[in-house]
Structures are given as C-alpha cells and as structure tokens.
Amino acid sequence: MSWLLSTMCLVHVCGNIFCLFETTTNPEAYMKVSKIVNHWGYTSEEYEAVTEDGYILPLNRIPHGKNNINSTAPKKVVLCQHGLFSTAGVWVSNPPSNSLAFILADAGFDVWMGNSRGSTWAKKHLYLDPNSKEFWAFSFDEMIKYDLPATINFILKKTGQKQIYYIGHSQGALIALGAFSTNQKLAEKIKLCFLLAPIATLKHVEGIVSLLPYFYPTAFKVVFSEKEFLSAVAFSKLHGYSCNAKVINDGCVAIFLSMTGYVPQHLNKSRVDVYIRHSLAGTSVQTLLHYRQAIKKGVFEAYDWGSQSLNMLHYNQTTPPLYNVEDMKIPTAMWSGGKDSLADTKDVAHLVPKISNLIYHKITADFSHLDFTVGKNAYYVSNDILKLLDKSETENLH
C-alpha cells in the first residue's frame, strides 16, 4: 500500500517540486480562458450560470470567428464540455488551426465552453465557502443533475435557440450520458451529441488511475482530505517554471501522459505548460472516489454512500441506482482511441451497444485520451465533427 500512496502523492504535490527551477513559458499558461481567446485575435465573452444547488459556473463564449464578425444571421450553437481534471481552456490550448473551439468559430458556429464545479475557474458558490468540506461534497452525480442543465438552459436563454449541439470529452461525455438518459426534457434540447474518448464503465482503465481501487475511501480521505484533489495551485506552478527545460520537461510529459495513455510523439512538448494549466485543474476527492467505485465495480451508477442506510436516505434504495445509458435517444457520434488508458477499448466496446441512436463511431488506433483535445493530430477529429455538423443541417440527422 505504501508505494501506491507514494505514487498518488507524487501526482498530487509534484508541482511544488518543479517550482525549484526557472524557465520561460508560453504566455497562455498564465491566462484565463477569455484571455487566451483574445490572445489569438478572437472575440471572447464570459457569463456565469448558477446551478439549482448554488454553484456558480463560468461559461466562455466565442460568438463568431475571425472571418464572420459582421454576420447578422443566427448561428448554430455548440457547447464544448471538458473532461476530468480539465477546464474550458482545454478547447483553446493549441493555436487556432488545431483547437476545436477556434475551428468551430471560424466555421460559423457560436461556441460555448462549460466549466464543471470544482475546476480552476468554478470555485464559487452562492453561500458555501470554497475552503469548506461542504463545498467539495459532490461527485459527477451533481454535475449530471445540476451542472449540465444549468449550463444548457443558460445558453438557450441567452441565444434564443431551442436546441444546441453538444461536444463532450472524457468526463464531459460521461455527464452527458448520465444527464441525457435521466432527464428527457434536457435531452430534447440537444440536436446531436458528440462524445470524444467517452468514459462510463471504467473496469479496464490503466495507468495511475487504475490504482484507485487499492485505496480504502477512509484512508484516501485521510491522506488527501475531503476537499480538493489535484489542486491547480500546485500543478499550475509547472507553467511558471521548469516544463520547458529538457530534463524536467520530459518528466512533466511522463507524469502528464501517465494518466491518459503514453503516446509522447502526439504531444507538442513546447506547450506542455499550457496543457498542464488547463488539463490538470483539480476536482473533489468525492468525485475521485466515485471514479474509484466505477473502476472497482465496472458499472455506471450513482455515488455509493458507503452503507445501505445512507443509500436508502439518498436514493430510497439500499444500493446506488444505475444510469441506464440506453434511455438516451439523441443521435450520437463517438470517437475513441486505441492507446487510451482511461477510455479503454474494452470499456468503449461495452458502451457502444448501449448507445440507442449511434450514428457514427470512429476508432483511431494510436490516439490516447488527450489526443482528441490537445494532440498534434486533434484536427482530424475536428474535421470529422465539422462534416457531421454540416450533414446534420443538410440531411436533418436530429
């Protein structure tokens, strides 16, 4: 057990180790999402959606591309939702030619980027202190039940649209599967659902995350507290110091890829500081324990409160209810990778037959988990998405 604790602790605090070295960084590593958008010459807007349980979620918007600034025609709306540990910044972490949000904006779409509770920019609440245990008492259940509905409904109200397109990566795919299968009114507001590196069941997960089942929840809470895990405060020090020095940079890359799938040739090492800033942004310990549960049990279900009596209190049954993915009827397109250690090919194969209205599924043999968002070849996926969006409008796929 000691070596497992050591490994997880290394990931948790290594940002403090790298702060001993100095180097230059990419300017975007210091920027909020809106500033990155402006940095590349695009118009940026910021909003806040308030969830039913009081969390304040930032929304970043690119209302138009560089070449359609003066267009008055109503634009189709796309919501991009980030994955585990990430922020909305993951969609703009590369230059415009290889960042999905910029590509969509230049193609004429009104692009919105959501931020899940507990990530770097989403640590505000109407009345809870972000330093309190109460603020961090959430898992992906609350993202499914509260975050996604609040985000989508805000966008619809602001744009006047009745439906939007949804793109979710990793956890962004998971909360879509959960929300759109349990909330049919919300599902009706989605034209087409795009899932990148989708996770639901995690039985075959590999890498550092696969160690989670070896931790008892009580011990995990003692070691990492009951608040935030993988704080961006620690990891963001990487973007201000040593991740461009060759030896240390290689260490950064190794840690970065150890959680997602090791295909280093797909990663632009000169931008690792930006990726770490926006792709290692923290979450709650309870969320991580929920993933531990999913890995250990191999099912997509609500959070297990640890006893039959507590489950009965929360769910009116002694065991956590399952998320029945089959109940999601939205036309869905999926992309998965053969080198993905989180969305393993065996888990994806288990998920595929449960997608009731799967219109497209592409497996890229050499893609890892993050290749779909920040990889050098991410534009291949962007091109596929644009083709399906065009087909959706012309052939009425939804």
Curated annotation (Swiss-Prot):
GO biological process: lipid metabolic process
Regions crossing the membrane: none
Tissues showing expression: Expressed in female lacrimal gland acinar cells from where it is secreted into tears (at protein level).
Keyword Membrane attributed: no
Residues in the signal sequence: 1-19
Gene Ontology cellular component terms for the protein in this record: extracellular space
Subcellular location: Secreted
Keywords from the UniProt entry: Disulfide bond, Glycoprotein, Lipid-binding, Secreted, Signal
UniProt keyword Nucleus present: no
Glycosylation site positions: N268
Protein name: Tear acid lipase-like protein
Origin species: Mesocricetus auratus
